[in-house]
Regions:
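Short, low-complexity disordered leader/linker segments with a strong preference
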Residues: 1-41, 62, 444-456
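Extracytoplasmic "Venus flytrap"/periplasmic binding protein-like
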Residues: 38, 55-132, 136, 149, ...
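Extracytoplasmic "Venus flytrap"
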Residues: 39-55, 73-76, 155-156, 221, ...
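Extracytoplasmic/periplasmic substrate-recognition and gating elements
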Residues: 87, 141-145, 164-165, 169, ...
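Hinge/lid segment of periplasmic solute-binding proteins
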Residues: 100-158, 223-226, 315-322, 382-387, ...
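Extracytoplasmic/periplasmic solute-binding protein
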Residues: 139-153, 157, 188-248, 292
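Long, aromatic- and glycine/proline-rich binding clefts that accommodate carbohydrate-like moieties
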Residues: 141, 313-320, 367-423, 451-456
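Glycine-centered hinge/linker elements that transmit conformational signals in sensory
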Residues: 191-200, 234-277, 321, 439
Length: 456
């Protein structure tokens, strides 16, 4: 999930991960019209929801006769691969499920088709989708009715925990004796740290376990997607809400410093050794192997974890990102689906968008492993009981925040990755110094973009 303005693109790519592995999948329907050769290629990341989308797409092929082809690449290569495709005006992708932070660059560089007229013609209303997903995935400029994507995959950071460990009488008794309260999913980050410390180094079923898993990955976006969950709760702001691009005193406020210090303290006290460059997959591995009591990760992975034969079912529980001293927020994940502007199959791609937006399709999308953003699905009376993590997902989507979606967001992200990782993992400098340097980095980026950066 990275994008830099065209002038800096080659420089950024050289510093980023260059290798990628493509996975092309094809789902062909049985309708005779498919033989006419109509085909769409949809590009996304290679993960469980993408497999669900392939299954869902079979219905589109049966209905339309249009064959669906899929280009899926690992998350570590997702931005490199597809932003290169878009930047070079490649016609590989007709449809793309692009990250939320791409929306500014994609709109301003005319990579995506603007969908306002199409939505009006087909009576697709953004009022029918969760507000956070419309703002995060569809709008550019933000808070304006200019739409470049349909919300496709609602997602955010949540937590899993070993419910079976938490429920053991001997563990409950020891915890209550030590802390004077019942052992339960944490409601605040202070409680989370306390629980993590309690489990750190404990032996359970003959195996040494650790308190918590949090993101530390350096190369793409991982540590930023982790630390922001704490920073938001402690009062960090990207800029002055009343004065855009005024970052001094907001990015590096005393509250933000405390949040960054807390994330480092949690990393130092309560995580497994060696996880110095870890993101989504490493978290899944740690939880599935019985290494950790609690795990930070995206809701997208929770259906698969719940089905896991070793740690799923009655053994797993879910909770929302805990609150901090200044509020309760969660880092937004997820993506919208867009039509690539240079596609030779624009009409067919728009037909897919129309089909995908239907309530019945969205309901099935949720049932088979995707995360719908459609209110008709998520606000239905039975939704909270439709999955063990559904209530937490609903709650989380009411308090999400996101990283910059500016066209220069790639450099902004690289800057934050470096400053946070240097402090948290590499033990370079103080939290105040890290955030002060980040303000300088971001000020330089925005000034190069011609933005008026206010110092006070």
């Amino acid at each position: 999930m990275r994008y830099s303005e065209t002038g800096k693109w080659s420089k950024w790519v050289g510093a980023a991960l260059a290798l990628f592995t493509g996975v092309a999948l094809t789902a062909v329907g049985g309708q005779p019209t498919a033989a006419q050769g109509k085909q769409l290629t949809l590009c996304w990341a290679a993960w469980d929801p993408a497999n669900a989308l392939v299954e869902l797409g079979k219905d589109f092929t049966k209905e339309s006769g249009i064959e669906m082809k899929y280009e899926f690449v690992p998350w570590t290569s997702y931005a490199d691969r597809f932003l290169n495709e878009l930047n070079s005006h490649s016609k590989l992708c007709d449809l793309i499920i692009g990250d939320s932070q791409w929306i500014g660059g994609a709109a301003e560089n005319h990579w995506y088709v603007k969908l306002n007229d199409f939505f009006a013609k087909e009576h697709i209303s953004m009022d029918d989708f969760m507000p956070a997903t419309v703002l995060g995935y569809s709008e550019w400029p933000k808070n304006t009715p200019n739409y470049w994507a349909l919300p496709a995959m609602a997602d955010a950071i949540g937590w899993t925990y070993r419910k079976d460990w938490f429920s053991r009488p001997e563990i409950q008794a020891e915890f209550k004796k030590k802390y004077g309260r019942d052992l339960a999913p944490p409601k605040t980050y202070e409680e989370l740290k306390q629980i993590a410390e309690f489990f750190q180094g404990r032996e359970i079923d003959g195996k040494k376990v650790y308190g918590a898993y949090i993101y530390t990955e350096r190369g793409s976006e991982g540590i930023t997607m982790g630390v922001t969950n704490v920073l938001y709760d402690y009062g960090f702001e990207y800029d002055n809400p009343k004065k855009p691009y005024q970052m001094q005193g907001f990015v590096n406020s005393p509250d933000a410093v405390k949040g960054l210090e807390f994330y480092k303290a949690l990393y130092k006290c309560c995580t497994a050794p060696g996880l110095t460059n870890a993101y989504m997959q490493e978290g899944l591995d740690a939880f599935k192997s019985g290494q950790v009591a609690m795990q930070m990760n995206f809701f997208a992975f929770f259906p698969g974890l719940y089905k896991d034969p070793n740690v799923g079912g009655d053994k797993i529980g879910f909770f929302v990102n805990p609150a901090g001293p200044k509020g309760q927020f969660s880092q937004l994940g997820g993506q919208g689906i867009s039509v690539v502007a240079v596609s030779d199959h624009r009409d067919d791609a728009l037909r897919y968008i129309k089909w995908f937006a239907q309530p019945a399709v969205q309901q099935k999308w949720w049932q088979i492993g995707g995360y719908s953003a459609l209110k008709a699905v998520v606000e239905a009376p039975g939704f909270p009981k439709s999955a063990p993590f559904a209530p937490q997902f609903l709650q989380t989507m009411t308090f999400v925040k996101d990283f910059w979606a500016e066209p220069s967001y790639a450099q902004l992200l690289l800057d934050m990755q470096k400053r946070v990782h240097d402090y948290v993992v590499a033990d370079k400098g103080t939290a105040q110094q890290a955030l002060d340097l980040l303000v300088k980095d971001w000020t330089k980026v925005f000034k190069e973009q011609g933005k008026e950066v206010m110092v006070q």
